[in-house]
């Protein structure tokens, strides 16, 4: 009975922490969203592709009224789904999922022209990303306070707020990246596979279905998502071979294969889009020379660290790897093997993605937005390492330990919120 009451109390605390996290996140987003101004041409393309007859429905050397522009950017009776799909295929640069979501928002908004048409989609993705980060930290540290503070620390960063404020697909892309990371965190917990009860089997199936859903959503939002998949699958193979869990490699591969089937059924235009758009030649040319650029791994790392830590990036170029190294030393022993594997996968995938995207993207197209999802991985690795180190070195238990850990969480929030040049 006492155990039941304790569990109920713990669940209530988690619920309160979760609700507080969501509320704070929503306030953050709405605050910055109210100051949003469209200053980037691609944001106009978002509205054009969803609501117009073509990619550029503006006539040169002809007077166009305000209503002409408004009609091109808002949903009307003559706008329909198939027209939007045709626009996406003509554009050939991005998959359709984000545009479909904005199409739904535009249909609900009607002829009202507002930045919140696109930001509403980003708001759900921003809050969803926060929820997933909360669940990841809950899984690793079993602390409502750390889960809440760590999540707020992530969402308060310049990079996450900028992703949310950009009326493009990168916040949704970040959401699916977070979901994919969470699915990998669950899949890499091999202790959970020991029990073979019906409930345990269903839970195992569920985590691979989650993995599959994340891959489908991620790839249908941004084609670069495939590099995250390749990186995490590579680490899964390495760990499973090391632990002689060859069946787990097969499970993971089957989940990816099922995802590939769904992707091809839902959007079979992906291959044409990737190989024949205006930038394909440059990307493919860079891909053929990728092994000649192995020496530039550092530049990919430097780029993403600079985007995450802003003015403090020079210090964090050294501090971040030192932090990870200290984590590996402090969190030694078999009892910490799970959290070490999680950090290895997240930090390793972040580095690999930064390198590949930096090499493949033509220099003229290189932009912060391609790295927003990767920045989330860097932030996760950073926060997990800090919390794990504090957890190991603070020997005192109970309230004293929770106090120290809370202080660590607050420090992370202060660090992350020190530079707020958000792109609005």
Predicted regions and their residues:
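Hydrophobic, aromatic-rich transmembrane alpha-helices
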Residues: 237, 311-341
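Specific aromatic-rich, kink-prone transmembrane helix
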Residues: 104, 132, 152, 156, ...
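Hydrophobic/aromatic-rich transmembrane helices and adjacent perimembrane loops
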Residues: 173, 227, 361-399
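Transmembrane alpha-helix segments characteristic
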Residues: 148-150, 210, 253-257, 333-360, ...
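Transmembrane signal-anchor helices characteristic of membrane glycosylation enzymes that use polyprenol
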Residues: 11-72, 257-271, 413-415
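Membrane-interface alpha helices of multi-pass inner-membrane proteins
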Residues: 201-223, 257-258
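Transmembrane-helix motifs of polytopic, lipid-linked glycan transferases
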Residues: 117-141, 179, 329
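Transmembrane-helix signature of polytopic, membrane-embedded enzymes
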Residues: 133-156
């Amino acid at each position: 009975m006492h155990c039941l009451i304790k569990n109920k109390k713990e669940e209530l605390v988690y619920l309160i922490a979760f609700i507080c996290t969501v509320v704070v996140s929503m306030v953050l987003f709405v605050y910055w969203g109210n100051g949003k101004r469209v200053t980037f041409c691609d944001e106009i393309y978002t509205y054009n592709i969803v609501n117009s007859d073509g990619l550029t429905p503006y006539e040169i050397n002809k007077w166009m009224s305000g209503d002409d522009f408004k009609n091109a950017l808002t949903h009307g009776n003559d706008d329909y789904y198939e027209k939007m799909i045709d626009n996406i295929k003509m554009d050939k640069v991005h998959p359709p999922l984000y545009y479909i979501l904005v199409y739904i928002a535009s249909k609900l908004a009607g002829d009202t022209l507002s930045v919140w048409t696109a930001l509403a989609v980003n708001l759900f993705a921003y809050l969803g990303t926060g929820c997933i980060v909360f669940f990841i930290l809950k899984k690793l540290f079993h602390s409502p306070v750390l889960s809440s503070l760590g999540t707020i620390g992530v969402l308060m960063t310049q990079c996450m707020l900028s992703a949310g404020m950009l009326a493009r697909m990168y916040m949704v892309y970040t959401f699916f990246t977070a979901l994919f990371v969470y699915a990998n965190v669950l899949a890499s917990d091999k202790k959970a596979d020991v029990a073979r009860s019906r409930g345990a089997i269903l839970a195992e199936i569920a985590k691979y279905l989650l993995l599959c859903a994340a891959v489908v959503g991620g790839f249908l939002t941004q084609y670069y998502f495939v590099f995250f998949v390749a990186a995490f699958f590579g680490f899964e193979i390495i760990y499973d071979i090391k632990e002689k869990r060859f069946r787990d490699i097969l499970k993971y591969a089957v989940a990816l294969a099922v995802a590939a089937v769904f992707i091809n059924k839902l959007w079979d235009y992906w291959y044409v889009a990737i190989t024949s758009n205006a930038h394909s030649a440059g990307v493919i040319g860079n891909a053929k020379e990728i092994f000649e650029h192995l020496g530039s791994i550092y530049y990919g790392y430097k780029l993403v660290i600079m985007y995450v830590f802003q003015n403090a990036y020079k210090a964090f170029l050294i501090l971040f790897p030192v932090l990870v190294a200290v984590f590996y030393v402090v969190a030694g022993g078999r009892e910490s093997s799970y959290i070490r594997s999680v950090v290895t996968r997240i930090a390793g995938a972040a580095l690999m993605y930064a390198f590949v995207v930096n090499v493949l993207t033509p220099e003229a197209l290189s932009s912060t937005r391609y790295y927003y999802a990767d920045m989330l991985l860097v932030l996760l690795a950073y926060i997990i390492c800090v919390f794990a180190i504090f957890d190991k070195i603070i020997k005192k238990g109970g309230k004293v330990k929770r106090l120290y850990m809370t202080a660590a969480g607050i420090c992370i929030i202060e660090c992350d919120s020190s530079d707020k040049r958000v792109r609005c």
